[in-house]
Amino acid sequence: MKPSGLALAFLVVFMMAIMYNSVQAAAIADADAEAEAIAKIKWGKIFKKGGKLIGKTALEAAANAAASEAISAMASQNEK
């Protein structure tokens, strides 16, 4: 029994569709992984910048408190 040309053409097209679909699925998975990695990097930068801002604010507050304490001590010595 000899297969017809139409059956062979259908088989070739079917195999190409399967191969294209598997390659496309792998590309989508790679793109998803890349997008997730980029999102983590961006959130890391946001948290890093926020941490620096919080640290800077805390240092300024501590410096202001120390300066205020020193001024109070000097004022109390001047009153004596």
From Swiss-Prot:
Chief place of localization: secreted
GO terms classed as biological process: defense response to bacterium
Keywords, sorted A to Z: Antibiotic, Antimicrobial, Secreted, Signal
Gene Ontology CC: one annotated term: extracellular region
Leader peptide range in chain numbering: 1-25
Record propeptide residues: 26-39
Post-translational modification: Truncated sequences of this peptide have also been found in the venom. It is possible they have been cleaved in the venom.
Family to which the UniProt record says this protein belongs: Belongs to the formicidae venom precursor-01 superfamily.
Name of the protein described by the UniProt record: U-poneritoxin(01)-Om3a
